[in-house]
Amino acid sequence: DVDGSGKLSIDEFTQIIRCFNTTVTDSEIAALVRQADLNGDGEIDFEEFIATQTYESGLKISIAGLRSFKKILLQYQKVAKFSSIALIEVDSELGAGTRGQSMGTAALREAAIQKQAARVHAENGVLSLDSLQVQTENWADALGHKHQYAKYIDKLYQVLSRTTDVVAQTLQEGLFPVVLGGDHSTAAGTIAGIKKAFPNHRLGVVWIDAHADIHSPYTTPSGNMHGMPLAMATATDNLAKQINDLDSDTLELWKLCQRLGLADGANFSIEDLVYVAVRDTEEAEDHLIETHQILNMTTEHVRTLGADVVAQRCLEKLEGVDLIYVTFDVDSMDSTICMGTGTPAPNGIFVKEACLLNETLLKDPRVCCWEICEINPLLDTLNTMVENSLGIFETVVDAIANRLEVTPKV
């Protein structure tokens, strides 16, 4: 009852129904509204609301569902009322093994402008073309790296710290951050920024990617830090699978990366991590996935259950968290349609599946930040990767705009 009238408007009633079941259709909601509004005044009073529990409908409410609903209501009070979307560009590529990811953010943004898919803040309050740009250190590539098992960690730490501050400030200003990332290493900064803005909230992460990205300098076979963001964010070293010995300088910088925005501890718990489409992993990562029983909704799950059901399973796994961060690495898609990325992998999801997956996730009011990364125009053919990514980006912006109750211009 947002306006304190003592009754639920049709919109308030609809929001409640969607909290219980994010996959319910508009027609199903309309039918339930017709049943509930007994006197036809366009509002649902207390007696009418209680009576809805006796109706035959597709909506089943359990005690567990009510507990989850209580947590969702708290999130509506705390973080769901964003005033608009803020676009943040972090075009860093030092964490990757190839070059070109730094061009991905600009390519996606340019494609959006050309297709008039970007929203203009001045006209409708949804998405500003004047994006926030995090200063990067890509110039350091020309000088080479000093840290064998955490390449460019000295420069990346600076980028991660800046990303932390920008994301935190954006959230504190009541804006929904949509992050356009270069390589995936900077996701550690995004996560730290969320935690900095909401230090007392329990954070969950949905990691949509072909790779687990949970190596540490102790376990990495390559030293590329785009494979380490989750180990940074969860303060995980995985010493049981150690193959590398670190020098004191690398170790000191690594500990700083693990404490981004914190005095101590981790930015989120590894138990509050969910994978989607992860399929190209290594032994050290498999050990962590098995040890911590990290849920991985595979491409096969997406095909057999449907992307919307998979999204719902992810949300159910994270029912105990207060906030959710969703990050989408384009290599989660099948290599036949995403060669424009540094580490493509076969047996991935397709564009329509990615759209539905992200759209369903974003209906949950606990989702407070979304990120897309690893687009590499230098490896692309006929701009396929950028165009596919643009379709997903448009879907996401529309989904967020619907939550903000605004109608964006396209």
Feature locations, PLM:
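Eukaryote-specific detector of the first structured module of a protein
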Residues: 1-5, 10-15, 46
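Conserved alpha-helical scaffold segments that buttress catalytic/binding sites
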Residues: 76, 80-410
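Short aromatic/basic micro-patch
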Residues: 7, 43, 267
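EF-hand and EF-hand-like Ca2+-sensor regions
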Residues: 19-23, 34-76
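Conserved tryptophan-centered aromatic signature that marks the ligand-binding surface of SH3
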Residues: 4-7, 31, 40
